[in-house]
Amino acid sequence: MSAHLQWMVVRNCSSFLIKRNKQTYSTEPNNLKARNSFRYNGLIHRKTVGVEPAADGKGVVVVMKRRSGQRKPATSYVRTTINKNARATLSSIRHMIRKNKYHPDLRMAAIRRASAILRSQKPVMVKRKRTRPTKSS
């Protein structure tokens, strides 16, 4: 079944839809922008990309849907864990999307999602309040 036909079926009646503030969002896996649109839908296309936080809380997991094995859903997804520094992680995601010939418009969305995940995993530095010395008379 073509992606356009699947989109016509799924676009208004999906269990992943969230309608808030006159906008429609989607919580489906491999939807990089969480937007209910044909371009970012993670269910209907033959090749999709998803970025998730790693289970141990360090690094990201890149989930790629392969073109081969469409009839075998259990083996159609490849999960790659990347646990490097931020620059190396983002460049490896960029290379994975480019070399495997995924949609070029998904590249920037995947990089932004991975960057936000890596930023959330950084430890937060607690700023100490400076105390003023008390006046002694």
Swiss-Prot record:
Protein's name according to its UniProt entry: Large ribosomal subunit protein eL28
Subunit structure: Component of the large ribosomal subunit.
Chain positions found as Phosphoserine: S115
Gene Ontology CC entries for this record: cytoplasm; ribonucleoprotein complex; ribosome
UniProt keywords, alphabetically: Acetylation, Cytoplasm, Isopeptide bond, Phosphoprotein, Ribonucleoprotein, Ribosomal protein, Ubl conjugation
Pfam families in the cross-refs: Ribosomal_L28e
The protein's role, per its UniProt record: Component of the large ribosomal subunit. The ribosome is a large ribonucleoprotein complex responsible for the synthesis of proteins in the cell.
Localization terms from the record: Cytoplasm
GO biological process, one term: translation
Cross-link (Glycyl lysine isopeptide (Lys-Gly) (interchain with G-Cter in SUMO2)): K58, K65
N-acetylserine: modified positions: S2
Family: Belongs to the eukaryotic ribosomal protein eL28 family.
GO MF annotation: an example: structural constituent of ribosome
Source organism of this protein record: Oryctolagus cuniculus
